[in-house]
Swiss-Prot record:
GO biological process: phospholipid translocation
Membrane side Cytoplasmic: residue ranges: 1-34, 328-344
Chain positions carrying an annotated carbohydrate: 66, 261
Stretches assigned to the Extracellular side: 56-306
Record PANTHER family: CELL CYCLE CONTROL PROTEIN 50, CELL CYCLE CONTROL PROTEIN 50C
Annotated source species: Macaca fascicularis (Crab-eating macaque)
Alphabetized InterPro entries for the sequence: CDC50/LEM3_fam
Record-given protein name: Cell cycle control protein 50C
Location of the protein in the cell: Membrane
Membrane disposition: Multi-pass membrane protein
Expression by tissue: Specifically expressed in testis.
Family as reported in the entry's similarity comment: Belongs to the CDC50/LEM3 family.
Pfam families: CDC50
GO cellular component, one term: Golgi apparatus
Length: 344
């Protein structure tokens, strides 16, 4: 018998289960019963989740007021870009029939505004927004430089078109007494946006840091002077600015504008009664046949008054169940045919 050379034996793998590929293995074996069980279970789960989410969304309190036509004079004024420096205000009274308990949030809602256009979304400078280089405007066409070649901060189309209506909610106790409802302008953003994606330059004096730059054409004041009441809410860390810069996926969307400061008269929420929205109308929507609304809403554990997620679960569950019954019918039919074949 011919012996194996010593140098060949040295190359042989160890006689272990791992190296000899003898580890125990499990091969999935899909039977009709197992597949049907998985489909039925998934369908039941999705249907139950969908019903729970829909009922939860229905339990929120929400009031929406479209003020595009109510403030028609202001809308017409804003159609002409040359009137941008002319102030226009309107007051919208409304009645809140029931108390809005707990935390109440104010949103602005836009119709027909396509924030998801590729060139629009890409027209921004992330290097600028994280405070690394405030004069980095390479990706911001067509809003990179002003007419006198000064860098625009914040640059880009999405920043230039920021929503700039001022909305004040007032509680009308009677014909002579009106209380301004306190709204907080902080805590409106996602944590990752506030502390990762947006940062101010290292200098504490933002005016000095932004020297040599100019504001976007549609902005009334520069980025470092957006909030006179709260110095921390200025620069790239301004909550309204961060909320606007998160582009919406659909042409109809709402964005958080403020949240109720539950103090004094509003500790439990918004009491029922007469209210009014006092709006400084700046953001033009009639140019693109759009509309805008202001929304007051409460939240539940799964969010606001949105049926999208609940309907998605319900439709998925219904389709899964339909597929389950179809597969079960096919399985029974084939099984009966097979049995009749053997009985022949």
């Amino acid at each position: 018998m011919e012996e194996t050379p010593q140098h060949c034996l040295s190359r042989l793998p160890d006689n272990s289960a791992l190296k000899q590929q003898e580890l125990p293995a499990h091969r999935l074996y899909f039977t009709a019963r197992r597949v049907l069980f998985v489909f039925f279970t998934t369908g039941i789960f999705c249907l139950c989740m969908g019903i729970i989410l829909i009922l939860s969304a229905r339990s929120t309190q929400e009031i929406e007021i479209n003020y595009t036509r109510i403030c028609a004079n202001c809308a017409k004024l804003r159609e002409n870009a040359s009137n941008f420096d002319k102030e226009c205000t309107c007051s919208i009274p409304f009645y809140l029939s029931g108390k809005m308990m707990g935390n109440v949030y104010m949103y602005y809602k836009l119709y027909g505004f396509y924030q998801n256009l590729y060139r629009y979304v890409r027209s921004r400078s992330n290097r600028q927004l994280v405070g690394k280089d405030v004069k980095a405007v390479e990706d911001c066409a067509p809003f990179k430089m002003s007419d006198n070649k000064t860098p625009i901060v914040p640059c880009g189309a999405i920043a230039n078109s920021m929503f700039n209506d001022t909305i004040i909610l007032s509680h009308n106790i009677n014909s002579s007494v009106q209380i301004k409802v306190p709204m907080l302008k902080s805590g409106l953003t996602w944590w990752t946006d506030k502390y990762v994606k947006f940062q101010n330059p290292s200098s504490k004096n933002l005016a000095d840091e932004f020297r040599g730059t100019t504001k976007p054409p549609n902005w009334p004041k520069p980025i470092y002077d957006l909030d006179k009441k709260d110095p921390r809410n200025n620069g790239f860390l301004n909550d309204d600015f961060i909320v606007w810069m998160r582009a919406a996926a659909f042409p109809t969307f709402k964005k958080l504008y403020g949240r109720l400061n539950r103090t004094h008269h509003f500790i439990e929420g918004l009491p029922a009664g007469n209210y009014s929205f006092n709006i400084t109308y700046n953001f033009p929507v009639t140019r693109f046949q759009g509309e805008k609304s202001v929304v007051l809403s409460t939240l539940t554990w799964c969010g606001g008054n949105s049926l999208f997620l609940g309907l998605a679960y319900t439709v998925t569950g219904a389709i899964t169940w339909l597929a389950s019954f179809t597969m079960m019918a096919i399985h029974i039919t084939l099984k009966n045919k097979q049995m009749s074949f053997f009985h022949q």
